Amino acid sequence: MNTDGLSREKVSDSQITSEQILQDAFQLKDEPLNRPKQSIQDLDELRSFQLTKRKEYEQQLNKNRLNFGQWLRYAKWEVKHNHDFPRARSIFERALEVNVQHIPFWTHYIQFELSHKNITHARNLLDRAVTTLPRVDKLWFLYVQTEETLKNYQMVRIIFERWLSWNPNPSAWDAYINYEKRYDEYDNAREIYIRYVQIHSSGEIWLKWIDFEMNDVPIDPEQVKRIRNVFELSVDSMLASEALRGDISLAEIINKWSLWEISVKEYERARAIFQLMLKSDTIQEIITPEQRNQIYSSYTEFEKSYGDKDTIESSIMIKRKLKYEEEVNKSPSDYDSWWSYISILQQEDNNEVTRETFERAIKVIPTDAFKSTVWRRYIYIWVKYAFWEEFTMGSIENGRNIWNKALKVIPHKRFTFAKIWISFAQFEIRNDPENGLASARKILGRSIGQSSTVKPKRKLFKFYIELEQKLGEWDRVRKLYEKWLELSLVGENNLSTINSLLTYIDFEKNIQEHQRCISLFELGVRLAEDDKIFTKVNPLEYMLMQFINYYKEEMRYAEARSLYRKLVERVSTPKVWISFALFESSIPTDSQLKAFEESTEEEFEFSIDETHRETTRSVFREANDFFKHNNLKEDRAVVIEAWKQYEEANGSEESLRDITKKLPVIVKRRRLIEGEEEEYLDYIFPEDEEAKPSKISGLNAFLANAQKWMANQN
């Protein structure tokens, strides 16, 4: 027998489950409190019951007089059970005395009267409510709704007018307009809109009026005029009001206006609207960039659909104008944008706006303390302005004032602009036949005085000198050149002295003043030899070469040769020696000169003869000996290579073989520098090795071994 199974069965019978607990709890729960039903048998019992209920309500209200739900239940009980309207109204009035601003109680009170069809009481209560709380829109809405439901339409208008006298929110105006629209009283609605936009002036209200005229009123010819008038009035009013100029609804109104004009087939009117908004400078100063961009986007879409080539180009021009205007407003120092913006304005022939824009641009002076690209672009704005006044406007006096103002802006002690000075001088010459030349000379003289504190301005001197040359004023030209030289010597860049001197020499050469040319060349050589003047670079070689070329052109070859001698003494470079050698083959010999002088022909056929070759070889030998003596192997190799090229062009086979034997052999060697070994190239000259009979050079040994190897091979 299984005792374990029996024991488990007994235990399970004695256990209490959760199901049993819940079942017992449900069976033993408290019964609901059932109040005994009270039956009223006579009038005394009724009055006793009423008194008891009223005491209960009053006790509750004494505990919390702000419990408006209790007041409401109290009043409803009086009506529902006792049909005592005066007592119920008394309860409502007592509640309002507690808090007259409690809007829900007002509405319940009014609904109470309406639900029992006490219309007169409800009207009186509504009138009292809006008089007591005129700023509460809900009470006004309830009032007009009640009167409209009662079809007392004239009273509704009176109530709305009372309401509007308190300057309510736009919702009151919208409700009044919607009321008139429901009964097709369009003239009344239009009159309300006229007052509406004056009290609540905004783009949104104008759009409501526009939508009303376009969508709610039947279309006829008179209505088309009304719609157009509303559009015009809305745009004019918004542009005239400082508070509404930045309203983004303006762009929406313009777009809606143009679309409406398109709908009535008035394409030119639509285009004129866009162009007026985008081209008028007065309007452009008023509207914001965001408005401008939206209007232009609408204009672009319009031209894509209804425009031709000219109108599309016009729209592109307007876009560029708006773009540059936005850029100059964002970055006033962007002179490229100023230039482009002004160019567009000039094409529009709006002279006053163009002049104002020029003035705006030139007021933004660059802050750079050096002659930067920004300064250059800024100065060109001045030049453009002056030319515009002179040539386009024909105002000579304005042009003169602009040139003078431009000169006052430039910091001449740091830098100047020759363009301004020269253009001003040309301006005076063009526009003043009597005194223009004198004025131009004063301007140019002033330019030299003010702008030469650091170094002379080459362009100024060049223009002034060319002007005097055209007039044949040689003495003035010489004075200018002398002043140029003087200022060049004072400045830091003394190389400009040589350049100005050479320009001076060219002038004297052109007027056949050869003695002056020679004197100026000699001055230049003396200056070049002065190390105190030229501290950074030495222009002696350049100056002497120019002097030599001058003598060569004048066929004064002996003087040129002596200058070459002086040059190789001071500047002994391979380049100078080679130039000297080739010079001897580039000039005619004495016999050739004599033959030319005796000849009647105007042209001389030059040819290199043996005299040229020997003289040139003599210079090459002298150069070779000089570099050999000074152990300048690389320079010596350069001279021999040039000599070889000369013999290839002008010499014989024998002379070419002789010079070829002089060519050095380049070998690699090693040497110690600061304890480190490095490779270098060395030049071995055969003629130097032949001069050493007691010692076989490395080259001769190498050649001997090579010959021996060839013999063995054979």
Swiss-Prot record:
It is found in: Nucleus. Disulfide bonds: none annotated. This is Pre-mRNA-splicing factor CLF1. PANTHER family: CROOKED NECK-LIKE PROTEIN 1, PRE-MRNA SPLICING FACTOR. GO terms for cellular component: chromatin; precatalytic spliceosome; Prp19 complex; U2-type catalytic step 1 spliceosome; U2-type catalytic step 2 spliceosome; U2-type post-mRNA release spliceosomal complex; U2-type prespliceosome. It comes from the Eukaryota. Involved in pre-mRNA splicing and cell cycle progression. Required for the spliceosome assembly and initiation of the DNA replication. The gene is CLF1. HAT repeats lie at residues 48-80, 83-115, 117-149, 151-182, 184-215, 265-305, 315-347, 349-384, 394-430, 435-470, 472-510, 555-586. One of its GO terms (biological process) is cis assembly of pre-catalytic spliceosome. GO terms for molecular function: chromatin binding; DNA replication origin binding. Belongs to the crooked-neck family. Associated with the spliceosome. Keywords: mRNA processing, mRNA splicing, Nucleus, Repeat, Spliceosome. InterPro entries: HAT, HAT_Syf1-like_N, Syf1-like, TPR-like_helical_dom_sf.
